[in-house]
C-alpha cells in the first residue's frame, strides 16, 4: 500500500485556469482586508480616539511598506539569478523580462516586517505628525500583530496551492508536482522509494519523492497558534504598549526557526551554514542553517530589543506623569 499522498490534481495556482487571478494574490487581498477590519475593531473596542481618515492613511503606509519590504527581500536576498539587479523594474511589476504577466510570485516576510515598521514610522512623523495615530503608534503595532496573525494562514494555503515552499522528504508526505526530483543514484533514494511504495523502473534517472507539507505546518503555528497566544494570553498580561508586537515578532521567529528544519532549503541558496554536507537522503544536521533561520534569529533578537526599548519608553512616560 502506498505510504504517500498525491498532490491534488484539481488544485492550481489560478483560481480559474486561464484567468490570471491567483490564490496567492487573493490571499494578500483577504489578509489586508482582515487586518484593516480587525485593527479598526480593536481601536473602537478600546475607545481610542483616532480619525478614520488618519487610520486609513496609516494603513496605506503599512500595507505599502510591507509589500515593498517583502518584495525587496525576496528578489534581492533570496533570488540569486541576478535578473532583478539587471532588470530592477521587475521587482515592482507583475511581469517577467519578456513582459508576460506572472503576478507577484515572491514575498519574504522578514522584509515585510521591516517595511511594515519603517513606512508607518515615516508617515506618522510627516503626514500624520501631531495626530492621535502618532500618539498611539505603539498601541497600533500591537493591534496589527494580532490582526495579521489572524489571517496569516491564508498566505501559506496559497503557497500550498502554488505547490511551493514544500518540505523535506518524509514517509506519508505529499508528492508535490513542482518538487525537485532526486537522482536515483543518490544513496538511499531507491530504498526510500521502495519503502513508500514507489516503483523505480530501470530507465528512471530521476524520481519525485513525498515531502513534508511544511507550508501548512508553518501556517498553522505562525497563524492560528500565534494568534491564540496573542489574543487569549499576552493581550491579558500586557503591561505597556508595544509589548505584543515584540512578542509577536519573537513568536513568529521561534516557530519559523524550528519548522525551517522540516522545509527544503531554497535551491539557489542551500544551507548558509553547511556544517554537514548532504550526501545521502538520510543525512541531517541541526547545525545546517538556512537563510530563513538566520533571518529568524535576527528577527527574534529584534523582537527582544523592541520589547526592551518600548518598556523603557513606557517607564519614562509613567515617570513623567508621576512627576
Curated annotation (Swiss-Prot):
What pathway does the annotation place this protein in? Protein modification; lipoprotein biosynthesis (diacylglyceryl transfer)
Which Gene Ontology MF annotations are present? phosphatidylglycerol-prolipoprotein diacylglyceryl transferase activity
What PROSITE patterns does UniProt report for this protein, alphabetically? LGT
What is one term from the GO cellular component aspect held by the record?
A: plasma membrane
Q: Does the keyword Cell inner membrane apply?
A: yes
Membrane-crossing segments per the record: 15-35, 58-78, 106-126, 242-262, 289-309
> Any idea which UniProt keywords this protein has?
Cell inner membrane, Cell membrane, Membrane, Transferase, Transmembrane, Transmembrane helix
What is its membrane topology? Multi-pass membrane protein
One GO BP annotation here?
lipoprotein biosynthetic process
Pfam families per record: LGT
* Enzyme type, top EC level: transferase
Q: Where does a 1,2-diacyl-sn-glycero-3-phospho-(1'-sn-glycerol) bind?
A: 156
UniProt EC number: 2.5.1.145
Q: Which family does it belong to?
A: Belongs to the Lgt family.
Functional summary from the UniProt entry: Catalyzes the transfer of the diacylglyceryl group from phosphatidylglycerol to the sulfhydryl group of the N-terminal cysteine of a prolipoprotein, the first step in the formation of mature lipoproteins.
Write down what this protein is called: Phosphatidylglycerol--prolipoprotein diacylglyceryl transferase
Amino acid at each position: 500500500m502506498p505510504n504517500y499522498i498525491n498532490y491534488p490534481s484539481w488544485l492550481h495556482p489560478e483560481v480559474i485556469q486561464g484567468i490570471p487571478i491567483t490564490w496567492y494574490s487573493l490571499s494578500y487581498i483577504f489578509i489586508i482586508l482582515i487586518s484593516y477590519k480587525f485593527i479598526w475593531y480593536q481601536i473602537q473596542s478600546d475607545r481610542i480616539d483616532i480619525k478614520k481618515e488618519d487610520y486609513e492613511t496609516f494603513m496605506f503606509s503599512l500595507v505599502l511598506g510591507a509589500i515593498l519590504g517583502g518584495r525587496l527581500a525576496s528578489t534581492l536576498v533570496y533570488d540569486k539569478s541576478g535578473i532583478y539587479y539587471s532588470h530592477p523594474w521587475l521587482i515592482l511589476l507583475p511581469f517577467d523580462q519578456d513582459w508576460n504577466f506572472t503576478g507577484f510570485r515572491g514575498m519574504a516576510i522578514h522584509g515585510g516586517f521591516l517595511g511594515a515598521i519603517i513606512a508607518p514610522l515615516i508617515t506618522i512623523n510627516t503626514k500624520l505628525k501631531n495626530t492621535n495615530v502618532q500618539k498611539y503608534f505603539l498601541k497600533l503595532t500591537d493591534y496589527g500583530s494580532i490582526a495579521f496573525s489572524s489571517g496569516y494562514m491564508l498566505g501559506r494555503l496559497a503557497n500550498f496551492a502554488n505547490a511551493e515552499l514544500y518540505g523535506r522528504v518524509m514517509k506519508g508526505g505529499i508528492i508535490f508536482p513542482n518538487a525537485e526530483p532526486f537522482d536515483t543514484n543518490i544513496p538511499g533514494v531507491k530504498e526510500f522509494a521502495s519503502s513508500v511504495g514507489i516503483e523505480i523502473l530501470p530507465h528512471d534517472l530521476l524520481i519525485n519523492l513525498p515531502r513534508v507539507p511544511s507550508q501548512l505546518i508553518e501556517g498553522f503555528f505562525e497563524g492560528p497558534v500565534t494568534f491564540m497566544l496573542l489574543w487569549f494570553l499576552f493581550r491579558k498580561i500586557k503591561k505597556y504598549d508595544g509589548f505584543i508586537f515584540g512578542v509577536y515578532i519573537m513568536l513568529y521567529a521561534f516557530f519559523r526557526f524550528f519548522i525551517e528544519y522540516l522545509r527544503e532549503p531554497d535551491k539557489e541558496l542551500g544551507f548558509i551554514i553547511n556544517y554537514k554536507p548532504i550526501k545521502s537522503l538520510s543525512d541531517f544536521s541541526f547545525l545546517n542553517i538556512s537563510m530563513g533561520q538566520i533571518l529568524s534569529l535576527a528577527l527574534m533578537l529584534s523582537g527582544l530589543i523592541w520589547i526592551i526599548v518600548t518598556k523603557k519608553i513606557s517607564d519614562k512616560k509613567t515617570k513623567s506623569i508621576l512627576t
